[in-house]
Amino acid sequence: MTAAKDRILELRAELDQHNYRYHVLDEPSIPDAEYDRLFHELKALEAANPELITSDSPTQRVGSVALTAFTQVRHEVPMLSLGNAFEETDMREFDRRVTEGLDLPAGDLFGGGAAVEYSCEPKLDGLAVSLLYQDGVLVRGATRGDGTTGEDISVNVRTVRNIPLKLHGTGWPATLEVRGEVFMSKAGFERLNASQLEVGGKTFANPRNAAAGSLRQLDSKITANRPLEFCCYGIGQVSHDISDTHIGNLQQLKAWGMPISHELKLAKGIGECLDYYRDIGERRNSLAYEIDGVVFKVNSIADQRELGFRAREPRWAIAHKFPAMEELTELLDVEFQVGRTGAVTPVARLKPVKVAGVTVANATLHNMDEVARLGLMIGDTVIIRRAGDVIPQVVQVVMERRPEDARPVQIPESCPVCGSHVERTQLVKRSKGKETISEGAVYRCVGRLACGAQLKQAIIHFVSRRAMDIEGLGDKSVEQLVDEGLVSSPADLYALKFEDIVDLEGFAEVSSNKLLAAIEDSKKPGLARFIYALGIPDVGEETAKVLARSLGSLERVQQALPQVLTYLPDIGLEVAHEIHSFFEDAHNRQVITELLGHGLQIQDQGELGAEFAASTTLGGFLDKLHIPSVGPGGAQKLADKFESLEGVMNADWLDMRQALPEKQANSVREFFALPEHRQLAEDAEKQLRDFGMHWQSEKKVVEGLPLAGETWVLTGKVELMSRDVAKEHLESLGAKVAGSVSAKTHCVVAGPGAGSKLTKANELGVKVMDEEAFIAFLKGHGISA
């Protein structure tokens, strides 16, 4: 027993220290796997010795038996709200009141008085909580409630990973009440909503609602699985003073294991407070969490006591609020727009309202599933949210304000742009040899490029900088070309003549010639760039690069079957089906043929990528057929036993049972009993042979890209090609292209106007190549400029 107890105490101390370094200092000291090993060792020891379990053990964060209701608790020191400032003059008036209250020399509304020291920190948008520690051990957690009475949420706060169950170090007061905010980061909020959607659970309108809803769960096991965090901002009741300043208090709390704001600062005078407010405001959208303002507090504890309180707020603190990110308004109508892939999506037309300082009259509704989830009707009062550069969105309906004449939102039967039929396509999730119909659906206009909206968006994407990079073709120019009937597919761009465009609005002789030259210059795209330009659903730049690097040629990309495509990194079966379906479409194949007929020469084509070609084994192939109940291990057993696809498909029952348990053996025989499954497997195997990547083939591959493992940097102007094209060429040779120079940089390509990067390269002794040498280098590797 003594050995077990000693080891338990040792593990708890070690895990507490690792938690502190990870959650408070942001300095993890061991890998996650090692932490998990220590945690599971402690859990096993406590399970074997339940009498040694204590409330402050790290294992007690997982949640306990669900409650039927929360009990009420009284705050010994009331949790008061703060006064608000909305304008700069409000802040200057607050500072004037503080200086007068402290009998300091006063200035006017624009300064001139004594410089009071203030603590500054962001006002987190979460749920205020009180944590009570007795002799360093967490004994109670409570909500703010009405400031005097809150709810006991002790079992839930124990599940928040960065709240210490026992304080670190020594010297803490016998009674210490820590106050702070429980919140959810933006990334955690997105993950939670995504997981809720997957299981058909409730989604949340914003991180604050998610945090509040999670913390007030009667079942603490649910809370334990939510990505909640805590940030300390002060103290309540305490048996003796900690420091003579507010910031001193927080720094000591941090030493005892409490997480505090990384943005905590000291400001001298109101001017520095306003500078801090502006700085945080500018960085607000890049912060990992949501804030709704900045809190300023007189830093001196003695001065705080002298200033005291008025009504239900302290005289020594104020919250300088940012413009609200959410507002109420009326949904006037729902209109429908058509995107590049034909998806018909709803857009909310709103009674104009100011949100975060910007007038909003339209908001995204994403799709009809979202309309149904919100229960949205035309005429509803809705909550609009706008955060940073994110398109405003409707996040909630205020049901109690729904008018009697509210109308349902209905998808149009015909395309609002071209009049073609709108079809409903059920979303399909493919896994383990079967197709699962999900609840979601997408509505598409069947008009394709005959639909002006789809055509315009397809052309805009095709000519964009990261696609074919045709300079001089902005959105308005594309709309003109389509509206004038000059362009009805991407291939038509390469048939344009001077006389076609010179008389168009915004064009003249010089701009027309420049455009034609830009179109001509785009005729030698890299394979990845060309694939991306085609606008294949779910294929972004990175997936296009994977396709190009792995398959090596446009022909193989066009021919690849879904089962073959899933060998590629980060391409699952659903994306593989999208790619295959795109190239199966006769119209898409015709557009590609026409593009090549206009003289496009796809660059960077060659053999299969070595990593891709080497990835094929019979076991892996069988696994990718997604035979029900047969995972990677079972697939490998089949490969070891039968050594060929034909052997597996034609195996008798006894041989199959020698390889697999009865259930799996039955599943394999039932799978290959279906002619369509046999055909699918045979077609995929044949394609692997045709591509030269069959497990029995002698593989012709790019064994090692010449620049594999090297880091290159581009600086200055590359005159014979765009920087993006130069980057593509280097990546096609295996290089990583970085944005800064370090001792690990292999080479810097320096064109005219190269600056600090060239200087640093010379200082570090990094190889430097001018543009002429770079072009020659590319030609030496079969790439023309």
From Swiss-Prot:
Gene3D superfamilies: 5' to 3' exonuclease, C-terminal subdomain, 6.20.10.30, BRCT domain, DNA ligase/mRNA capping enzyme, Helix hairpin bin, Nucleic acid-binding proteins. Zn(2+) binds at C415, C418, C445, C451. One of its GO terms (biological process) is DNA replication. The active site is at K123. Its EC number is 6.5.1.2. InterPro entries: BRCT_dom, BRCT_dom_sf, DisA/LigA_HHH, DNA_ligase, DNA_ligase_AS, DNA_ligase_CS, DNAligase_adenylation, DNAligase_N. Residues 702-785 form the BRCT domain. SUPFAM superfamilies: BRCT domain (SSF52113), DNA ligase/mRNA capping enzyme, catalytic domain (SSF56091), Nucleic acid-binding proteins (SSF50249), RuvA domain 2-like (SSF47781). NAD(+) binds at D32, A33, E34, Y35, D36, S81, L82, E121, R144, E181, K297, K321. It is an enzyme of class 6 (ligase). DNA ligase that catalyzes the formation of phosphodiester linkages between 5'-phosphoryl and 3'-hydroxyl groups in double-stranded DNA using NAD as a coenzyme and as the energy source for the reaction. It is essential for DNA replication and repair of damaged DNA. Belongs to the NAD-dependent DNA ligase family. LigA subfamily. This is DNA ligase. The gene is ligA.
